């Protein structure tokens, strides 16, 4: 992850609200994996700034590589992304068998055999499999056998892809929760990114199960009576799901580290990113202070930064890492605009 910000972002000119807390997460993920990522995007803010016809902010690099993005419905996005993963898995399995056939052929040259073997050795590694794929295609290009021609014809499916499912808290905590739970429980190598604004942002700021107790918003004008649903704890209860809670403005290093670890983990992962929204009604400057609001949320103890890495448990280490420090409660005020008072 060192030097990640020198990489080309494959998300640009999104048209999101000025200061949006969601787009920095998506932009960062495209910098890390954009040349080989698939995105299934739930309906909501992230699908509006993510693809408002006839334009899309997702772009390509100099090689013509970029995120493959699609949107189904609000309620089935997790299942939709899961289907994308299974389809890619099935195609790659067939292509792998064809590469094995070529590698075992007596007619294959030493160069072709070496390229095939390197591809097979890196088959499950997204970082190294891309270069191995380029070498394989170059070695097979021009070969006359039907198997080689089919491999080259389907070259876009050869490299290991990074499968992502994007959506907001209204989708992940409420309407699409059943699908999110199903996908995480599957044990498959898939990544879920939740842009947590703690309300239904795209439809005007209604309360969701991600809204915290006391939060004032539509359908909760007197303050939400029930506490926030702990999606992270639910996912951690499985024991084999990588889970992280991040806030890019508060701790960029932790955010980048967790995103990289989640993608590298050979199983399901869930990342919940705190995303201030203009509907939060941030005083004195509004979304100019988006990143500062993330810092305040973490410093006060309102939003904790942590990760749960099952790979550490297998190595005999504590899988849970708490990055944020003890909260400073003096930063939290009673929600009374005329007389805000510290709660401690």
Question: Model-derived features: where do they sit?
Answer:
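Proline-centered helix-kink/hinge sites
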Residues: 268, 337-340
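Cofactor-binding active-site loop characterized by glycine-rich and histidine/acidic residues
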Residues: 2-194, 200, 205-214, 221-226, ...
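Glycine/Thr-rich phosphate-binding loops of Rossmann-like dinucleotide-binding domains
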Residues: 49, 280-281, 343
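Glycine-rich ThDP/TPP pyrophosphate-binding loop and its adjacent helix/strand module
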Residues: 159-165, 174-190, 195-329
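Single conserved hydrophobic/aromatic residue that forms the stacking wall/gate
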Residues: 332-333, 340-343
């Amino acid at each position: 992850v060192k030097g990640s910000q020198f990489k080309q972002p494959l998300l640009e000119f999104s048209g999101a609200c000025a200061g949006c807390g969601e787009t920095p997460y998506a932009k960062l993920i495209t910098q890390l994996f954009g040349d080989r990522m698939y995105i299934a995007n739930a309906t909501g803010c992230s699908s509006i700034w993510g693809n408002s016809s006839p334009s899309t902010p997702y772009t390509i690099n100099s090689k013509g590589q970029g995120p493959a993005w699609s949107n189904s419905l609000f309620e089935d996005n997790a299942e939709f992304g899961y289907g994308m993963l299974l389809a890619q898995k099935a195609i790659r399995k067939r292509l792998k068998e064809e590469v094995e056939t070529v590698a075992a052929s007596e007619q294959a040259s030493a160069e072709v055999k070496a390229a095939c073997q390197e591809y097979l050795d890196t088959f499950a590694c997204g970082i190294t499999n891309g270069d191995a794929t380029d070498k394989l295609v170059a070695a097979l290009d021009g070969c006359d056998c039907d198997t080689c021609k089919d491999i080259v014809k389907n070259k876009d499916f050869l490299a290991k892809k990074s499968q992502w499912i994007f959506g907001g808290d209204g989708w992940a905590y409420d309407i699409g929760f059943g699908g999110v739970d199903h996908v995480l429980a599957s044990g498959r190598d898939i990544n879920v990114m939740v842009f947590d604004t703690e309300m239904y942002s795209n439809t005007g700021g209604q309360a969701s199960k991600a809204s915290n107790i006391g939060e004032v918003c539509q359908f909760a004008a007197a303050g939400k009576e029930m506490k926030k649903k702990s999606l992270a704890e639910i996912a951690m209860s499985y024991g084999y799901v990588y889970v992280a809670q991040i806030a890019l403005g508060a701790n960029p290093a932790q955010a980048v580290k967790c995103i990289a670890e989640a993608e590298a983990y050979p199983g399901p992962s869930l990342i919940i990113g705190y995303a201030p929204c203009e509907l939060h009604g941030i005083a004195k400057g509004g979304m100019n202070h988006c990143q500062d609001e993330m810092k305040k949320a973490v410093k006060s103890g309102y939003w904790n930064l942590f990760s749960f890495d099952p790979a550490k448990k297998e190595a005999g280490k504590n899988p849970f890492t708490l990055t944020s420090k003890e909260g400073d409660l003096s930063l939290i005020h009673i929600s009374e605009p005329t007389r805000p008072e510290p709660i401690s």
